[in-house]
Amino acid sequence: MRHGHPPTDIHHGINQGEPMDDNVLRVGIGGPVGSGKTALIEALVPVLIERGHRPAVITNDIYTQEDAQHVRRTLAGVLEPERVVGVETGACPHTAVRDDPTMNLAAGAEMLERFPDTDTLLYESGGDNLTLTFSPALVDLFLFVLDTAEGEKMPRKRGPGITESDLLVINKIDIAQYVRTDIGIMEADAHRVRDDRPVVLTDCLTGVGIDDIALYLESRRKVLI
């Protein structure tokens, strides 16, 4: 039986509807512009496939298919290009994944109809601010991606994306020293404002931390699916 997120408060933008009762884990991936959401997907998909999963990807951009095209190019030979679909939202990113996820729900349903073997559906939001969350009608859980270039102060700014996401990802740890970010402080503050809910440090370009994310998703799959 699927559980997903419980009914949520104003920060989530309450959305009607129950998640579908199937064996697909639906994962939202949000975060600011340039934090590495697309890079995370491109690093995570091969690991999921290697671990026996059958992922598909739905990206969100306001006006273009840029992220979907990038994912297809990067994962050529790894993931069938038809398993990557871009949604042009024409609106603020949080609208399409939280307030009115109709377009994404339709894209997901079409993807599952076309590829019924899919067991993991990744929804990438367009870049947004710290208030971004996902509708429980759309996803079972969501990840929020920060990066060290934004500064070690970011976790202390809180916001629902940081405090309420199921998993917080701190990306680009490889450049922390060059942008004068103390990873230790950033990670400690993240744990503190999240009441010790999980935080993963990643370098998506080299794969550091990606196995930890895959293991986390598998652990949640056992509970949610």
UniProtKB/Swiss-Prot annotation:
GO biological process terms held by the UniProt record: urea catabolic process
Residues reported in the UniProt entry to bind GTP: G31, P32, V33, G34, S35, G36, K37, T38
Pfam families for the chain: cobW (PF02492)
Family annotation (Gene3D superfamilies): P-loop containing nucleotide triphosphate hydrolases
Keyword field: Chaperone, Cytoplasm, GTP-binding, Nickel insertion, Nucleotide-binding
Molecular function via GO: GTP binding; GTPase activity; nickel cation binding
InterPro entries, sorted: CobW/HypB/UreG_nucleotide-bd (IPR003495), P-loop_NTPase (IPR027417), UreG (IPR004400)
Subunit structure: Homodimer. UreD, UreF and UreG form a complex that acts as a GTP-hydrolysis-dependent molecular chaperone, activating the urease apoprotein by helping to assemble the nickel containing metallocenter of UreC. The UreE protein probably delivers the nickel.
Protein's job: Facilitates the functional incorporation of the urease nickel metallocenter. This process requires GTP hydrolysis, probably effectuated by UreG.
Name under which the protein is recorded: Urease accessory protein UreG 2
Organism of this sequence: Streptomyces griseus subsp. griseus (strain JCM 4626 / CBS 651.72 / NBRC 13350 / KCC S-0626 / ISP 5235)
